[in-house]
Design a protein with these regions (language model features):
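Bacterial N-terminal signal peptides that target proteins for export
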Residues: 1-10
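Conserved RNA-binding domains used in RNP assembly and mRNA/RNA metabolism
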Residues: 17-109
Length: 109
C-alpha cells in the first residue's frame, strides 16, 4: 500500500460519519419567530406573535430563536407554527447550516 492511504481512508470515513450525523433528527427548544425579525421584533405596538404572523404573511419564513441563535424553519406544520408564534416550542428536525427541516412541532411545557 502507498504511504498515506490509511490517512486518506480515515479522512473519508470521518467525512461520511459527519455527513450521516448531520441528517440525524435533533430536538430544539426555543421561541417561534420569523426569519426577518429573529429575536428583535420591530413592529411598533404589536406583540411578538402578531409581528411574526405579519412578517410570515409578507413572505418571511418561520424561525426558531434558541439563545442568541436564529434558525430558519423549513417545512413542518404551518398551522402549528402559527399557533405557537411568539411562544416557546419544541421542534424536532434536521439541522443543516442555520436551517432546521422540521419533522414535528409541539408547545414547550
Amino acid at each position: 500500500m502507498r504511504p498515506g492511504f490509511h490517512r486518506v481512508a480515515a479522512m473519508l470515513l470521518l467525512l461520511a460519519v459527519t455527513a450521516f450525523a448531520a441528517d440525524k433528527p435533533q430536538i430544539f427548544i426555543g421561541k417561534v419567530s420569523d426569519a426577518m425579525c429573529g429575536a428583535q421584533h420591530m413592529m411598533a405596538g404589536a406583540s411578538d406573535a402578531d409581528c411574526t404572523r405579519a412578517c410570515v404573511k409578507q413572505g418571511s419564513k418561520y424561525a426558531l430563536v434558541v439563545g442568541d441563535k436564529v434558525y430558519t424553519l423549513e417545512g413542518g406544520d404551518a398551522a402549528a407554527l402559527d399557533k405557537l408564534a411568539g411562544q416557546n416550542a419544541i421542534i424536532s428536525g434536521t439541522l443543516k447550516g442555520k436551517t432546521i427541516t422540521v419533522a414535528s412541532v409541539a408547545p414547550a411545557k
